[in-house]
Curated annotation (Swiss-Prot):
Pathway: Genetic information processing; DNA modification. It comes from the Viruses. This is Beta-glucosyl-HMC-alpha-glucosyl-transferase. The keyword Glycosyltransferase applies.
Length: 280
């Protein structure tokens, strides 16, 4: 069964991701050694607390450590302020909406697990449930291949290695790097719309916010653009509205993903035969 893994740093009292799990499922929270007692006291009855050395560097280093520790397993890494919910189509404007009120029921949670297990069996060794920032219409279907997203990612670590994923090769925006890195090795990515996520406020205290600034973020994006220039392209319009990340030491840059989705993978055809892409 898929193991949910929640990396967390300086967020004792704010791990809202735990709200999505039924009582008979044990998620793991990965923390620095010096925070083990505080997290155990707060969440030890609801999750297993896993430690990594205090010297592990940032979220990219944390994710690399997680992919090392869980080698051979199927995992779903999810931000500590993120929960996965059901979605439904709103007919009046043909918009897919996330259920912001109700968590998954016991049955729905295990249906989600099976849905993604099926995706992995079909060849989707990495994927995510979408954060609905932009409008998702019925024409998008229940999922889309090679569409980028963040806040959560699943990996079949029986099929992918830490080196293949590429965490630790870039300090920030590591999810974007891993997404492109795996696609360019021939591993398609699956973005779910049937299930959407509710996530916490950007730049909340702790976590990545403790190390992120505009300049650090921009240097990471520049590295991604150098390595994947055709798929990670600079966005030049409507970027002035982007909020600053920590210190406003320079204007924030933005990349847009340009990954071809015209030719579907073998994994897509296998998964579509089991779970049709079309909205009911």
């Amino acid at each position: 069964m898929i193991q949910f893994v929640i990396p967390s740093y300086q967020r004792v009292g704010a791990v809202s991701a735990l709200d999505m799990f039924p009582t008979d499922y044990e998620p793991h929270i990965v923390v620095r050694e010096h925070e083990e007692k505080a997290y155990n006291d707060a969440y030890g009855s609801r999750a297993k607390i896993i430690t990594i050395p205090d010297g592990v560097n940032g979220i990219a280093g944390t994710r690399k450590a997680i992919t090392d520790m869980y080698a051979g397993q199927r995992i779903w890494m999810i931000d500590d302020d993120t929960t996965i919910r059901m979605s439904s189509m709103r007919k009046r404007d043909d918009r897919r909406c996330v259920d912001k009120v109700n968590q998954l029921t016991h049955e729905q949670f295990y249906e989600l697990i099976q849905y993604v297990e099926d995706a992995m069996d079909c060849g989707y060794y990495h994927g995510h449930a979408r954060l609905p920032i932009f409008k998702i219409t019925s024409s998008w279907g229940n999922y889309r291949e090679n569409s980028y997203g963040f806040t959560n990612t699943w990996y079949d670590l029986g099929k992918l290695t830490t080196e293949q994923i590429g965490y630790g090769k870039i300090d920030l925006c590591e999810d974007m790097y891993a997404f492109l890195n795996l696609i360019n090795q021939g591993y398609p990515h699956l973005a779910l719309f049937k299930y959407l996520v509710v996530s916490g406020k950007a730049q909340a205290p702790g976590g990545c916010s403790s190390i992120r600034s505009n300049s650090k973020h921009n240097r990471a994006l520049e590295q991604i653009n150098r390595e994947f220039p055709e798929q990670a392209r600079w966005k030049t319009s409507n970027i002035e509205k982007r909020k600053s990340l920590g210190e406003e030491d320079e204007p924030l840059k933005v990349l847009r993903m340009c990954v071809s989705r015209k030719e579907k993978s073998e994994a897509f055809h296998k998964f579509n035969a089991i779970h049709p892409i079309a909205v009911d």
